[in-house]
Amino acid sequence: MPNTMQALHTRPLNENLITKSLTAADYVATLDAMLSRTLERISLKKEQGLRTPDELWIVDHNDVYTLGQAGKEEHILQRTNTPIIKTDRGGQVTWHGHGQLVMYWLFDLDSISWSVRNMVSHAEQAIEDVVNDCLKSTASTDTNHISARARRDAPGVYLYADMATETDSAPTSDEIEVDNTIMIGKIASLGFKIKHGFSYHGIAINLDCDLSAFNAINPCGYAGMQMLRLADFVNMNQATNIQPNNLPLTDDKKTLTYEQFTQQLIDNIAQRHAGDIPLRELAPK
């Protein structure tokens, strides 16, 4: 029986960007739909000169392991009942499932004057912005020394602890980087595919997923990479509870909802897409 996909719920953000939402999504059906839509947009641009709105797909996947173009079978450490799908995105092996926010970027890069490097940096910095805002909003002594950062040597977003505020004793030189922080793990992954200047695939942020699924693989090809989720650093609740006008969390309301995080990230990406948030200097090596 062929894989089928539910209808996507569509919402326009502006004339050049729309969102589409999908829950309990089958990976193969979603990939087929992304590729089909991308090829359709390429054809419309080449044959008719039409610029179609870019699309940000907000997806909640059923459990699946995916092998990117650089993926190696040896990075799958255990065989489970979870499907393993070979795909055409960049990167190696990862897991998708419930409690993880996946956003697919179906963008015409030429129309927004982005290079592939620009897109990757915008993706990482958007995640940094929103995760750091959420970490700060908790005002917790357990998380006020934690920050989200990208790395030049390994795509994605990672959490770092500021050792200077965590302990009075001086850490040894082999424990930390020169800026007095230590990486504690990875919270977000990314992998894109570019076809004739159009992107698809995208980013995945661990919000309140079951991290044990990562134990069966070397995430993104890195043996022993510690995967993290936001729910272990802030109070999260999946119940819909978006505050009016998407206001930041206040001191007396420290519970973050899945929907709040999603909306903040959509807003940040939309502003970057419109040119309203410039890129910062790239992360140090």
Swiss-Prot record:
GO terms for cellular component: cytoplasm. The keyword Membrane does not apply. Its main location: cytoplasm. The keyword ATP-binding does not apply. PROSITE patterns: BPL_LPL_CATALYTIC (PS51733), LIPB (PS01313). One of its GO terms (biological process) is protein modification process. Catalyzes the transfer of endogenously produced octanoic acid from octanoyl-acyl-carrier-protein onto the lipoyl domains of lipoate-dependent enzymes. Lipoyl-ACP can also act as a substrate although octanoyl-ACP is likely to be the physiological substrate. Belongs to the LipB family. This is Octanoyltransferase. It comes from Psychrobacter cryohalolentis (strain ATCC BAA-1226 / DSM 17306 / VKM B-2378 / K5). The gene is lipB.
